[in-house]
């Protein structure tokens, strides 16, 4: 789905292997998407794994954080999707709710045992996300973890029903956006078009 969305937006998609020479990888691309995947190792945000924290791969976490740091140093357009938003937040000093269904006030976001749901999001009016997608819309929700603290990132969107962080961005970069939902499954073409522009 990511490949077709980038292609549809006018970009040339390229899948990056998990290991390799990061500098030459970044030199060969014009923008970076970090997408969904397994849980993030709690060690990256100085916590022990909770009982519901699923399989995680610290090497992937540190590799992705290195890619993100390198891409942003080059002011390369960046889009983090689901886990990609989470690892972007952790890379900026953020923290995670390890399991939303056991976090008071944040139950029911789906994502555990393959559950999926939908809810509204409210977007900050002065954000890049609002200029791309508007100030409120419906998103899919299939994540059992969530960002509890976005670190040095600006919060650009929250879930309408419980205030959970659903969007983050860096205003000092030309395009650095993270979203908790899966825009490629929701037909949110405008995000990919804005990334490729």
Give the residues covered by each predicted segment.
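Hydrophobic, aromatic-enriched interface-forming segments
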Residues: 85-87
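Conserved G/P- and acidic residue-centered "switch" motifs that form tight phosphate/ATP-binding loops
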Residues: 82
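N-terminal beta1-alpha1 cap of cysteine-dependent amidohydrolase-like domains
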Residues: 1-79, 90-91, 97, 101-138, ...
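Active-site-proximal beta-strand elements of phosphoester/diester hydrolases
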Residues: 176-181
């Amino acid at each position: 789905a990511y490949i077709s969305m980038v292609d549809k937006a006018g970009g040339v998609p390229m899948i990056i292997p998990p290991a390799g020479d990061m500098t030459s990888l970044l030199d060969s691309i014009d923008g970076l998407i970090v997408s969904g995947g397994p849980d993030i190792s709690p060690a990256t945000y100085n916590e022990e794994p909770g009982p519901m924290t699923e399989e995680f791969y610290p090497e992937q976490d540190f590799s992705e954080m290195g890619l993100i740091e390198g891409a942003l140093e080059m002011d390369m357009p960046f889009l983090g999707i689901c886990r990609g938003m989470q690892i972007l937040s952790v890379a900026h000093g953020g923290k995670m709710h390890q399991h939303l269904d056991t976090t008071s006030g944040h139950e029911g976001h789906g994502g555990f045992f393959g559950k999926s749901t939908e809810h509204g999001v409210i977007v900050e009016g002065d954000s890049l996300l609002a200029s791309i997608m508007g100030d409120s819309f419906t998103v899919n929700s299939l994540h059992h973890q969530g960002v509890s603290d976005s670190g040095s990132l600006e919060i650009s969107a929250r879930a309408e029903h419980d205030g959970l962080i659903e969007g983050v961005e860096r205003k000092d970069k030309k395009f650095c956006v993270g979203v908790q939902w899966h825009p490629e499954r929701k037909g949110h073409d405008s995000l990919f078009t804005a990334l490729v522009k």
